[in-house]
Amino acid sequence: MSEQDIQRASLLARVNFPIYCIKSISERHILIGGGGGMAKTGISNPFEIYELTYDPVTNTARATLATHFDVGANAIMNMCVIPSSKYLFELACGGMQGMCHIYDVKFRFKNGLTTNHHDDHSNDQNNSSSNYLRRRHMSLSSQNSIEDIEENIEEYHGPTVEIKNKLKTDSDIHHNDNQDGDKKNSVPNTIPDYIFDFDLKESFQTDFHSDEPYQKLIKYSLNANMVFSAGADGHIGFWQLPNYKLLTRLKAHENEIDDIDIHPSGRHLASVSRDGRSLIWNINNYKLVTSLEHSQVIPKPTNKEKLSIFTNAKYLPRLCRYSIVEGDENNVRLFVALNSRAKLDSYICKWTIQKDQYYMQKIISAGDVPLFAMAISDDGRFLAVGKQTGDIDVFIAFSLQRCYQFSQAHNIFVTGIEFLSTTQASLELVGGDVDAALVSVSVDNRIVLHKIPKRATLGFFGSFLFFVLFILFIYVTMNYFDL
């Protein structure tokens, strides 16, 4: 791994379960969820919260486990955070069986006790979770979908698959940590003297697919004051807060819904599905606003071989995200990612919104690898995608110009990406001198930090020099033509 790669990406943590989702819950805390499902493999189904702190030895962030909480029989496939205060929030999560579970999550101190943290902490986690966390068991049973995912994972981890690993291995990290004992001792690796308590508040069914009910998505909107669910049965659930009252189950699509997102104003909801449709819904009256047509704007490939495939290929919308335009919270755009089942390029489409009308503004190729995850920074400046091959790409949202690329950050497809807060305090944790930072997760059990370097500028001296040269050029030109 090159020095440049180390500066751009680093391994925050390696866990002992597949990770399916990640959320940033404060300027210095991230929450992950996942697990092995109901399969009797000994793999738990937990939430974990990590504290990010600045490490002066490596000039980047380090992650320390603050809380481990096992939810029981079912893996956490998706989640959303409903904040009450800085360290008090409700957590909606779900997956198999089409169930949604609501947890109250509260911050508290451990009586001031701080103990040394060890990398091999699975036994300590189980003991601490039984002492500090309140847990309620749920009797839910479904196994087929989890087993399918595990077969997919085993296929990717098989001996015939060769993976180029650009990240620090555990031995590399151990070697670096022992290079300078004094420096290592100056940054003690300790468990925080606080914890987050998880308390199950309620559970309810959101998906009613006849064969395999599966809640695939759960999203929260502050301005709409609602939580929205979607999954295998093609319906979108509108749940009013604070009591999670079901307002309606909208039959939005004929097939499984792959993604939904909510307009920052809380007026519109975008949904994309395996039925090939990208739809915009009015949240207030549950009516269809418009259908986005992508097929007409996808450019034809110039390669003859790809052109023959393109003729019969079908592009499906896979991901969608609303975003504010940088510097203007009243100006919103929508990004939609398109994948093809054939070996063709994937695309990112940008739609502008004017008076509730959607107009295609730009479309770019994101390479010939399917896109699996998407995130946008809170200031609207950057858009990130995670790919089937484990790659992470970041684009400038305004121009859709790629500004960061890290190949095979994970050994398998990316399941989740999340930008850290763009506040100064949060960026200082990763070493500063960056425009943004994001964290990616996968079923390869790894949490990886990516740092987006500041874009090069001329600076004051460079701008002054450019101005002087420009004036000199004008003078010489005018003198040459006797003007």
Which residues fall in each region the model found?
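Conserved strand-to-loop turn within each blade of WD40 beta-propeller repeats
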Residues: 34-36, 43, 94-97, 230-233, ...
